Every structure is written in structure tokens, then in C-alpha cells.
């Protein structure tokens, strides 16, 4: 299963400004079509030539998600908002090491090479496709698309034999189908000073909050061969050099990332603009769940920071249950350890799987244990200050902020008061939003060029970096860090009338090609974008007892 970067960088031609009586879109422009979602796996198989069973020269990269012990206690912990140390997690909820070693031995016995190191949530296993097919009782087939791309896949549900089934019930990596996307950029975009002003981040920065002592961790699938673009960006905007703050993590077991496409640069430049002294740690992997799960698992195990910014996703209904469940088991551990995890909700509006498919969300943003970040279009007044936002939705190029109803996950307790008619009691996304429209996007430097980028992958590091500033303030005041953000965010949204000023810019106009923005929470923009200074004050109140 492929994972897609959710960045929208498009070649644009700047036109004359089109003004309403009071406001203009930031840098209005006409744009070339944004790349559409790749076909679902089932559609790709129908279009592809069947090459027969994957043979012994085809290597598969499997990740088995380990089941936490004491499930009732673990569920109570996640629901309480409390956190545990890595050592306490291993002692109370981690898998039984002896049972895991039995499972590793069983996998090795069929001709795969399996490894596990505590406190990992994953058994990694590589080897010939026929060996994996035999172990899991599935047929793994090879295919070739019309463009010559080859991939392996199975549409069958795996059956895990004992002793594997004693410690895991899920596996990812049974296909390597992926849809890579290419991008270009155009001049313009919001400068860092605009972002600080529009989202009321400037008062936090003026108070000395710059991310010092915070670390943002980023799973990425497109490479960063050098720091040239980052160095130019920092120099242009008077920001600290990236070098002392940036760590790049690679491992052969995580596969090879794709060539640079702008996603990694976008994430890092936006995060650095908001929290310029926060450390940044990138975990590179190949763009499939088998490899990506391993990198994410190591990210959680390393626990180098308390914030994750993830701008990746796939069509939720098309994501195999094994891949979803392995990822979810890793994310459960992240929540228990107190990590905040922001995930882009997608750039195809309510149609993450394509306009020829039913509305659907983007996984993993649909997980109830992450904060899903949707998209807006920003408008400024004629005086150049923040005026309003609309839900991002462009029928011309069929793009917009991801949002809608999960097919698989029930609505969590924190969202019970926001359930809307189409939900049928299911999780709804996004939770929050920020500027994502490429026509009103962010100034970046990529490939040596000044350019403008959008997508919910731009809004996601903006949220992550803002929380880094809030965490810094909380720690200075002797309070706990944000951790899993959603209970607090929903408390703020539901009590916004009592919080003055309000912590959100409530977006009440526009749509994401299906769902309309409205007062309060909605499936186009969640609670809206942040007023960072007001949100910092609200978070302090929440943790001190106003809602915690």
C-alpha cells in the first residue's frame, strides 16, 4: 500500500488581484491542476497486467504490530489523558518478550528474516514473497501497470499462525503499490512574518517563546540530499541555521525514500518559521506501510521529542486492515508516552480516494488518536492584515481540505457532542485547520527556487510548531506538556464563548467539495484555525483545571 505526500505545490501564473469590497485572497492566482489521487489498489490491479505469482526474487518487507498487554487497563489509560514513561509502558503494556521471541523464531523458520528489539511495537520480517505467502496463507501476485511500473500485492486477508497469533493479529507490507507524485513551485506566498501575524503567533514569539527545548519529529518519504534550500530559506528570513537543529535519520530496514518532491522541505521550512529554535528530527522511509511502520515505530521508541508532524496519508477504505492496525498499535504507544501527533487530512476535499469514488477520509488522519489538520483559504484586508478564512475547496482543480466520516473508527468520547447527521456514530475529521490553498499558500524555497506551497501538509507543521511554542510556555510555568491534543481542543471549541479571546478562528464559509463550513465544528475545517496567543492561554486554563 502506498503512502502519499499531502503537499500541493503547483505551477501558477500570477494574475491581477481580484478584490471584494473589503478583502482579497492572499496572492490570488490561476493554477495548473494539482496532481489527483492515484488509483486505489483494487483499481490498479484491474488496470494492470497480471504477471503471475511473485517469485523467490521478489522481497517483501513485513511489519507485524504487537498487541499491548492488559488491554482494559491500557484503554483506561488512553481515555484518562494520563501518560507513562517508556519503562512503565514496557512493564505494564509491552508484549511478553518470551512470546515475541517464539514468534520471531517461527517466522525465521519459514525462510524470512525476523527481528525485534524491545520496546518496539513491531516485528520486522524480510524475505522472499513465496515464504511470506506460505506463512500467512495468501497469494501474493505480481503486476505491471501500463506505464511500466511493477508491484506486488494481495487482496486476501492474512491468517497468522501460532505462535505469531499469540502476540500479534496484524501485518503490513503485503503490497508495495505506491503512487508517487511530482511537484513544481511558483513565486509568492505567505512570508513567516505574515504567518506569525495572521495566526496571532507573534505575541508568543515576542514573549521569548521560540521552541527552545522542544523537538518536532517528522516521518517523511521524499529525500533531502542536502541542506541547500533550507540554508537559503533561513538566510532569507533571518532565521537560525538549520544545521545545529536538524537530525536526519535513515536505516536500510526503513527502505529508500523517493527523490525530493518538496514535502520534506515544506514541512521543515514552515516548522522552522514558527518555532525557529525547536529541534527537528526527520525519519526517512520508503512510501509503503511496511517500511513506514518501522520508521514510525523507531520514532516512538527513540522518543526524542514530544510532537509529531506527519504530512502523509492514503485513501482510508483502500488501506488494508492490517496496515491500519499495525499503525494504530504504534500510535497507541505514542499517546501513552505523551506525544502530540498532527496528521494532514488530505488535499482532495472529501474525495481522498478520487472523484469517481464515494467520499472518504485519509488514513491515518481518521485515527481517533491523532489530530487531523484540514485546510482553509486565507483572506487579508486591504491593509494587509488577517481578515477571514474560507474552507479550502476548488472545483476547478478538484482540490480541497480533507474531511468527512471514517469508515472504520467509532466517534471518540471527545467528539460525541459534535456528531453530525452523516456520521452514524463514526469518527469525523478534521479536528482543526489552517491555510492550505496553494493560491494563498506559504513561501518556500525548493530546488533553489523561491516558490509557494499549500496543501494540508503545510497546515500540519504550522500546528505542530505552534504547539511547540505552547509546550515551551507550559514547561516554563511548571505545567505538563500538551500530549494528546484533541480532548483539550474540543474542550476549547465547546467552551469558546467563555474563553475571551476565542482560541479558534471559526470558519463559517466555503466547502471542501462536499461538506460546508459552519459555525462551530464542521467536516470541512473542524474547529477552524488557531489564534495562537488565545490558545496558549486556554491551554494553561485547561491544564490547571478548567477542563483537564
State each model region's role.
Residues 14-17:
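C-terminal motif of bacterial Sec signal peptides marking the signal peptidase cleavage site
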Residues 384-403:
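Short, surface-exposed polybasic-and-hydrophobic patches located at secondary-structure transitions
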Residues 19-21:
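Bacterial signal peptide processing site
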Residues 376:
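A short beta-strand-to-loop transition that corresponds to the Sensor-1 phosphate-sensing loop
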Residues 419, 471-523, 547:
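An often Trp-containing, charged/polar helix-loop segment at the C-terminal end
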Residues 368-372, 380-386, 463-471, 485-488, ...:
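Predominantly extracellular beta-rich ligand-binding scaffolds that present long acidic/polar faces
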Residues 1-7:
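Bacterial N-terminal signal peptides that target proteins for export
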Residues 26-119, 124, 129-372, 399-456, ...:
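Substrate-binding/charge-relay-adjacent region of secreted/lumenal peptidase catalytic domains
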Amino acid at each position: 500500500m502506498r503512502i502519499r505526500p499531502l503537499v500541493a505545490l503547483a505551477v501558477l501564473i500570477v494574475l491581477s488581484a481580484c478584490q471584494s469590497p473589503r478583502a482579497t485572497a492572499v496572492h490570488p492566482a490561476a493554477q495548473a491542476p494539482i496532481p489527483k489521487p492515484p488509483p486505489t489498489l483494487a483499481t490498479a490491479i484491474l488496470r494492470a497486467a497480471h504477471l503471475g505469482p511473485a517469485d523467490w526474487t521478489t522481497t517483501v518487507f513485513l511489519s507485524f504490530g504487537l498487541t499491548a498487554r492488559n488491554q482494559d487497563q491500557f484503554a483506561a489509560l488512553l481515555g484518562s489523558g494520563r501518560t507513562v514513561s517508556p519503562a512503565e509502558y514496557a512493564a505494564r503494556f509491552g508484549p511478553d518478550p518470551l512470546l515475541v521471541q517464539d514468534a520471531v523464531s517461527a517466522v525465521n523458520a519459514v525462510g524470512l528474516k525476523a527481528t525485534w528489539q524491545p520496546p518496539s511495537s513491531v516485528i520486522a520480517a524480510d524475505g522472499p514473497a513465496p515464504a511470506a505467502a506460505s506463512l500467512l496463507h495468501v497469494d501474493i501476485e505480481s503486476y505491471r501497470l501500463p506505464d511500466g511500473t511493477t508491484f506486488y500485492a494481495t487482496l486476501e486477508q492474512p491468517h497468522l499462525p501460532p505462535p505469531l497469533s499469540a502476540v500479534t493479529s496484524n501485518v503490513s507490507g503485503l503490497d508495495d503499490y505506491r503512487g508517487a507524485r511530482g511537484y513544481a513551485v511558483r513565486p509568492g506566498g505567505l512570508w513567516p512574518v505574515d504567518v506569525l501575524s495572521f495566526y496571532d503567533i507573534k505575541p508568543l514569539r515576542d514573549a521569548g517563546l521560540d521552541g527552545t527545548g522542544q523537538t518536532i519529529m517528522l516521518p517523511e518519504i521524499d529525500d533531502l540530499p542536502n541542506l541547500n534550500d533550507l540554508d537559503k530559506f533561513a538566510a532569507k528570513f533571518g532565521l537560525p541555521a538549520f544545521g545545529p537543529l536538524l537530525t536526519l535519520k535513515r536505516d536500510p530496514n526503513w527502505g529508500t525514500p523517493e527523490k525530493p518532491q518538496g514535502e520534506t522541505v515544506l514541512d521543515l521550512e514552515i516548522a522552522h518559521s514558527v518555532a525557529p529554535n525547536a529541534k527537528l528530527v526527520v525519519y526517512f522511509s520508503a512510501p509503503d506501510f511496511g517500511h513506514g511502520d518501522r520508521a514510525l515505530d523507531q520514532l516512538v521508541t527513540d522518543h526524542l521529542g514530544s510532537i509529531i508532524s506527519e504530512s502523509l496519508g492514503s485513501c482510508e477504505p483502500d488501506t488494508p486492515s492490517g496496515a491500519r492496525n499495525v499503525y494504530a498499535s504504534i500510535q497507541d504507544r505514542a499517546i501513552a508516552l505523551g506525544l502530540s501527533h498532527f496528521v494532514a487530512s488530505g488535499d482532495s476535499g472529501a474525495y481522498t480516494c478520487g472523484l469517481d469514488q464515494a467520499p472518504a477520509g485519509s488514513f491515518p488522519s481518521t485515527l481517533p488518536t491523532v489530530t487531523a489538520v484540514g485546510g482553509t483559504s486565507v483572506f487579508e484586508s486591504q491593509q494587509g492584515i488577517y481578515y477571514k478564512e474560507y474552507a479550502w475547496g476548488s472545483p476547478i482543480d478538484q482540490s480541497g481540505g480533507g474531511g468527512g466520516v471514517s469508515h472504520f473508527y467509532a466517534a471518540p468520547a471527545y467528539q460525541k457532542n459534535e456528531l453530525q447527521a452523516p456520521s452514524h456514530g463514526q469518527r469525523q475529521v478534521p479536528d482543526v485547520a489552517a491555510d492550505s490553498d496553494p493560491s494563498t499558500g506559504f513561501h518556500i524555497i525548493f530546488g533553489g527556487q523561491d516558490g509557494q506551497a499549500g496543501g494540508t501538509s503545510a497546515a500540519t507543521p504550522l500546528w505542530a510548531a505552534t504547539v511547540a511554542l505552547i509546550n515551551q510556555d507550559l514547561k516554563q510555568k511548571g505545567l505538563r506538556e500538551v500530549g494528546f491534543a484533541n480532548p483539550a481542543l474540543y474542550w476549547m471549541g465547546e467552551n469558546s464563548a467563555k474563553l475571551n479571546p476565542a482560541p479558534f478562528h471559526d470558519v463559517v464559509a466555503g466547502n471542501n467539495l462536499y461538506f460546508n463550513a459552519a459555525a462551530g465544528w464542521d467536516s470541512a475545517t473542524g474547529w477552524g484555525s488557531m489564534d495562537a496567543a488565545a490558545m496558549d492561554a486556554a491551554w494553561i486554563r485547561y491544564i490547571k483545571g478548567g477542563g483537564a
